[in-house]
């Protein structure tokens, strides 16, 4: 098994409820190590750029508005099969379909306010990490 990196966002619904520590603890309990982390308030331009792949989707405007509605915590996570492990601990996008004990089942308010984002592939993880972090900000 290879050690890899993935990208995670703790979304505004979770930071608003002071869940950053609880969510990070679940990630660490799953064997992921936080190698970079910062709390930011995304600009509209950042959110539109980050979620640009969804630009033509009907939910794009609402997604951008939500992601700029409050602070987020962007993180680089490292571990064995980090992308798959992070997605497993996050749970299904819709918290109603998420397994018990997952972040979304435990903390999400709705399919839109689902507390976390995680990269869906190693390739996208690199793109997403590079969007928010300089190499010197990642300390393994």
Swiss-Prot record:
Q: Which UniProt keywords apply?
A: ATP-binding, Cytoplasm, Kinase, Magnesium, Metal-binding, Nucleotide metabolism, Nucleotide-binding, Phosphoprotein, Transferase
Coiled-coil spans in chain: none
Q: Which residues form the active site?
A: 117 (pros-phosphohistidine intermediate)
Which BP terms does GO give this entry? CTP biosynthetic process; GTP biosynthetic process; UTP biosynthetic process
Q: Where in the cell is it found?
A: Cytoplasm
UniProt xrefs under InterPro entries: NDK-like_dom (IPR034907), NDK-like_dom_sf (IPR036850), Nucleoside_diP_kinase (IPR001564)
**Which Pfam families does the UniProt entry name for this protein?**
NDK
What's any one GO cellular component for it?
Answer: cytoplasm
SMART domains per record: NDK
Uppermost EC category: transferase
Keyword Transferase in the entry? The reply is: yes
Highest taxon above the source species: Bacteria
Record GO terms (molecular function): ATP binding; metal ion binding; nucleoside diphosphate kinase activity
Q: Which Gene3D superfamilies match?
A: Nucleoside diphosphate kinase-like domain (3.30.70.141)
User: Where is ATP annotated to bind?
Assistant: 11, 59, 87, 93, 104, 114
The coenzyme or cofactor needed here is: Mg(2+)
Which family, according to the similarity comment? Belongs to the NDK family.
Q: Which PANTHER family match?
A: NUCLEOSIDE DIPHOSPHATE KINASE
Subunit text: Homotetramer.
Q: Sorted alphabetically, which NCBIfam families does this protein's record hold?
A: PRK00668.1
Provide the function of this protein: Major role in the synthesis of nucleoside triphosphates other than ATP. The ATP gamma phosphate is transferred to the NDP beta phosphate via a ping-pong mechanism, using a phosphorylated active-site intermediate.
Q: Write down what this protein is called.
A: Nucleoside diphosphate kinase
Q: Which gene produces this protein?
A: ndk
